[in-house]
From Swiss-Prot:
The lineage of its organism: Bacteria, Pseudomonadati, Pseudomonadota, Gammaproteobacteria, Alteromonadales. Residues 122-159 are annotated as: LID. One of its GO terms (cellular component) is cytoplasm. The gene is adk. It comes from the Bacteria. GO terms for biological process: AMP salvage. InterPro entries: Adenyl_kin_sub, Adenylat/UMP-CMP_kin, Adenylat_kinase_CS, Adenylate_kinase_lid-dom, P-loop_NTPase. PROSITE patterns: ADENYLATE_KINASE (PS00113). This is Adenylate kinase. Its EC number is 2.7.4.3.
Amino acid sequence: MRIILLGAPGAGKGTQAQYLMGKYGIPQISTGDMLRAAIKAGTELGNAAKRVMDEGKLVSDELIIGLVKERIAQDDCKGGFLLDGFPRTIPQADAMKEAGINVDHVIEFDVPDEVIVERMAGRRVHPASGRVYHLQYNPPQNDGKDDETGEDLVIRADDQEDTVRHRLGVYHEQTKPLVDYYQSEASANNCQYHKIDGTKAVDVVSDQLSSLLG
């Protein structure tokens, strides 16, 4: 089972990716992890990527596709894989198709921007332990303080409202067009497209995925 997860940052893809990996026994493939592994292993593609990154440049789609092909040829991907955070753009999706990397299911997590801003802007973190709270869904016992140590909670830079809105803007500009792209692919019977309401409770979303994917 080969799956692509689509959705804005904060839409709940990461949580459901963990669920799908456990249920179907397939690895999650993230481009960041792949790059780090290839560089560490000193593969030809890894060395090429390192040279580009050392110059402060972005790794080309061609290189990333090469890494994806290399990764999905490994034994643990025989039963399928889960792509999260890739492809991000139409050219990347086209390059994947040209490289013969086919997928069975594309799952879009649909969550309104304002809900995502509320989700992320409400997060508070205890830096020393990594404990995460949420002002609305999981508030600390004492405002702004960690339950166990009483130490101050902080807002991560990634969760600041202006940062979240910027990331959402990038998503809508670059990645949202993939929704139309993969809906067209589904119409041509090249994959199945599923749109999930990501505002529902985590276990409800997991159950829905389970019934959709079988």
